[in-house]
């Protein structure tokens, strides 16, 4: 029976250029690599108290009771995939991810989750660039103040299925970029 939850942090992660991997490596090798990546993503989510809802090909959907755990898992996902050896094919390099996180109520039904919060998290993945973690204002507000230092406001945008704009932020996870951003931290929400 469908059941509404309290607010959860919904995280989508998608492996960048996976279609190109199949062309470059062939079906078997590409599928093996993608499965290895999805395993790394799952481990990162579980390490930070996440619940794996499902994996869909080159994508993972998980949720977290705490937004701080979701952001920590997203950073770990990028770092884990970043340790994989680069693909030695022209036009490719390292495996990268697109990650989006939104916080809100969802409907749980049959082990899956549905609702506006899930849709917004999925839209963030579509908006993100490789190696980015995009989050919404709801996630920023749920973070502990000490975890907001690497957050940068990007823009407001209308996403498919929403009548009003959402505020999009980037969570900077790479140390060299974090050093730059911390010189002008997000102060609007502290």
Predicted regions and their residues:
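A short beta-strand->alpha-helix segment at the C-terminal rim
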Residues: 84-90, 97-105, 126-164
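Catalytic NTP-binding/metal-coordinating core of nucleotidyl cyclase/transferase enzymes
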Residues: 2-73
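Intrinsically disordered or compositionally simple regulatory linkers and C-terminal tails
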Residues: 1-2, 171-190
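A generic structural signal for short hydrophobic patches within well-formed alpha-helices
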Residues: 18, 70, 106, 139-140
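Short amphipathic alpha-helical segments
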Residues: 121-125
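Catalytic core of nucleotidyl cyclases, primarily class III adenylyl/guanylyl cyclases
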Residues: 44-71, 84-118
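Short amphipathic alpha-helices in soluble, non-transmembrane regions
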Residues: 73-79
């Amino acid at each position: 029976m469908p059941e509404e939850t309290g607010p959860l942090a919904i995280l989508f992660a998608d492996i960048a250029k996976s279609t190109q991997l199949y062309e470059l490596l062939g079906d078997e090798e590409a599928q093996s690599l993608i499965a290895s990546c999805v395993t790394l993503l799952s481990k990162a989510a579980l390490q930070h108290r996440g619940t794996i809802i499902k994996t869909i090909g080159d994508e993972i959907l998980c949720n977290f009771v705490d937004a701080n755990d979701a952001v920590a898992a997203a950073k770990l996902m990028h770092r884990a995939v970043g340790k994989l050896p680069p693909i030695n094919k022209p036009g490719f390099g390292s495996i990268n991810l697109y990650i989006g996180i939104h916080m809100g109520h969802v409907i749980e039904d049959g082990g899956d989750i549905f609702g506006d919060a899930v849709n917004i998290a999925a839209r963030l993945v579509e908006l993100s660039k490789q190696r980015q973690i995009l989050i919404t204002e709801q996630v920023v507000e749920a973070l502990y103040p000490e975890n907001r230092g690497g957050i940068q406001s990007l823009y407001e945008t209308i996403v498919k299925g929403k009548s009003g704009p959402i505020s999009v932020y980037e969570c900077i996870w790479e140390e060299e970029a974090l050093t730059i951003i911390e010189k002008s931290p997000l102060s609007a929400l502290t």
